[in-house]
Amino acid sequence: MALPKRLSAEYTMFVILEYLFSNSGGISISKYHIMTKIPELKQQRQDRISAILNTLETKDLIISTVTPNATFYRISEKGKTMYLHWISEFLKFFRDIKN
């Protein structure tokens, strides 16, 4: 089953947080990097990713650093906590089904 061209905002937020948590090593990365290195996001429009990054930043889940050439993002401590909470709830759901 192919992924739909447009993913839900919630799923997109989760995928971005997961990538920043798992792959960035605490290093800030650009929106271009996010859009090209996360397979699920390659079909998403740039303005949509920008809006989602803004939402994540407004909720203090990511931190941005603005430079003359680009804006770079990294996950915040609050974002790490939220991501781990979401993952534990997800795993709990599947463990409950299994038992």
Sequence positions of predicted segments:
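Short amphipathic alpha-helical interaction segments
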Residues: 42-58
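Short, cationic-aromatic polyanion-contact patches
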Residues: 67-88
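Residue at a beta-strand N-cap/secondary-structure junction
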Residues: 26-28, 43, 72
